[in-house]
Design a protein with these regions (language model features):
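Active-site residues of response regulator receiver
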Residues: 52
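Non-catalytic signal-transmission and effector/linker regions of two-component phosphorelay proteins
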Residues: 1-5, 11
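Receiver (REC) domain active-site loop signature in two-component systems and cognate sites
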Residues: 55
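Acidic catalytic/metal-coordinating carboxylates
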Residues: 33, 59-62
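His-Asp phosphorelay/catalytic-motif detector in bacterial-type signaling
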Residues: 45-47, 72-77
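Short alpha-helical segment
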Residues: 36-37, 49
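Two-component/phosphorelay signaling modules centered on CheY-like receiver
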Residues: 10-32, 39
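Short amphipathic alpha-helix used as the core "switch/output" element in two-component signaling
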Residues: 61-74
Length: 77
């Protein structure tokens, strides 16, 4: 079963996305801040990341740049 990380600061949107994905038989971990997401990446890499562009602690575009600059996460969709 695929693991998807949802990174979204709006709690309502995050919950809707999480429920929809779980109902489609995906494993889902959700985060409201980029810092939480980065800590989770240290433990396990997901198969897919759904990433909000505007987060309270970091811009989503900057997160993508950071992921692309590291060999372990370079090809992470």
């Amino acid at each position: 079963m695929a693991l998807i990380y949802v990174v979204e600061d709006d709690e309502n949107i995050r919950e809707i996305e999480t429920i929809a994905l779980k109902n489609s038989n995906y494993l889902v971990k959700s985060f409201g801040r980029a810092s939480e997401f980065y800590r989770a990446l240290d433990d396990i890499l997901p198969d897919l990341v759904l990433l909000d562009v505007m987060l309270p602690d970091e811009n989503g575009c900057d997160i993508v740049k950071r992921l692309r600059s590291q060999s372990a996460t370079r090809r992470l969709p």
